[in-house]
């Protein structure tokens, strides 16, 4: 089992790292008390090989030796990788002032500045025990995400799942769509009596639509649009991209166009999915 432990000062980006780890398939637990770590790993044994926990100052042992002892007593076969995130006092003060969140060490008579300084003193020994110390003072969330991926995977590439989905406007638009294309202006097989009972998955319908210049041109234009902007969407650290294609009933045109786009991108580095909402119960 691989265990990633994320510690560090409050406001330095631990939650960002946990989100990255979750995207990479890790089972993540936020603010886990270290004495419960053995129990957690035992419970997860056999169900997952990737576990990540974050630990804040309230859950850290007061003595350095106790901290090392708990890490040394991990279950046999556990591969530990540890991160410590830090930022300058000035940056942390600015971040907390902007978000107006309460610092974990804030007390009625303790100022934010004092809480930040006190946490630095408490965690300084821990910062010297980890595998990777990362100063996030000058990193945005995307820079930090890329840095974590590079450490764990050896590259910053992230698998983008592209979901092409057909639908019928008469049944409502999909709320999860990132891009939506209306193909109701294209020639409609519904008006061909022999094609009406079929769908865009059937060869006669596909043949009919493939012979329509406007259909081919529109598919080509969508392909070029997506190919142009996909690199920019990847740099925005997306995990999923949903492209919705809609016609009137979601039976013919939208299904065909969705299938063609999925085939065009099938050999890309992305994971491609095709779904037909109005055919899903068939």
UniProtKB/Swiss-Prot annotation:
Keywords: ATP-binding, GTP-binding, Nucleotide-binding. SUPFAM superfamilies: P-loop containing nucleoside triphosphate hydrolases. Displays ATPase and GTPase activities. ATP binds at residues 8-15. GTP binds at residues 56-59. It holds the Pfam family RapZ-like_N. GO terms for molecular function: ATP binding; GTP binding. Gene3D superfamilies: P-loop containing nucleotide triphosphate hydrolases (3.40.50.300). This is Nucleotide-binding protein in ptsN-ptsO intergenic region. The keyword ATP-binding applies. The keyword Oxidoreductase does not apply. Belongs to the RapZ-like family. HAMAP family: RapZ_like. PANTHER family: RNASE ADAPTER PROTEIN RAPZ (PTHR30448:SF0).
């Amino acid at each position: 089992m691989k265990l990633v432990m994320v510690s560090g000062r409050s406001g330095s980006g631990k939650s960002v790292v946990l989100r990255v780890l979750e995207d990479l398939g890790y089972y993540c637990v936020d603010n886990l008390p270290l004495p419960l770590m053995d129990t957690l790993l035992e419970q997860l044994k056999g169900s997952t090989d990737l576990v990540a926990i974050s630990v804040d100052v309230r859950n850290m042992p007061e003595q350095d030796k106790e901290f090392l002892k708990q890490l040394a007593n991990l279950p046999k076969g556990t591969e530990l990788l540890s991160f410590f995130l830090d930022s300058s006092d000035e940056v942390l003060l600015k971040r907390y002032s902007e978000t107006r969140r309460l610092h974990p060490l804030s007390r009625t008579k303790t100022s934010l500045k004092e809480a930040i300084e006190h946490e630095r003193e408490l965690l300084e020994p821990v910062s010297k025990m980890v595998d990777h110390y990362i100063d996030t003072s000058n990193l945005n969330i995307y820079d930090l995400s890329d840095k974590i991926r590079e450490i764990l995977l050896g590259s910053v590439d992230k698998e983008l799942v592209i979901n092409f989905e057909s639908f019928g406007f008469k049944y409502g638009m999909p709320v999860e769509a990132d891009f939506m294309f209306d193909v109701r202006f294209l020639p409609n097989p519904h008006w061909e009596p022999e094609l009406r009972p079929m769908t865009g998955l059937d060869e006669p319908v596909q043949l009919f639509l493939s012979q329509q210049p406007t259909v081919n041109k529109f598919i080509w234009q969508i392909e070029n649009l997506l190919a142009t902007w996909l690199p920019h969407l990847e740099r925005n650290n997306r995990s999923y991209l949903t492209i919705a294609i809609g016609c009137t009933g979601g039976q013919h045109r939208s299904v065909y166009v969705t299938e063609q786009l999925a085939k065009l991108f099938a050999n890309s580095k992305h994971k491609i999915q095709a779904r037909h909402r109005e055919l899903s119960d068939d």
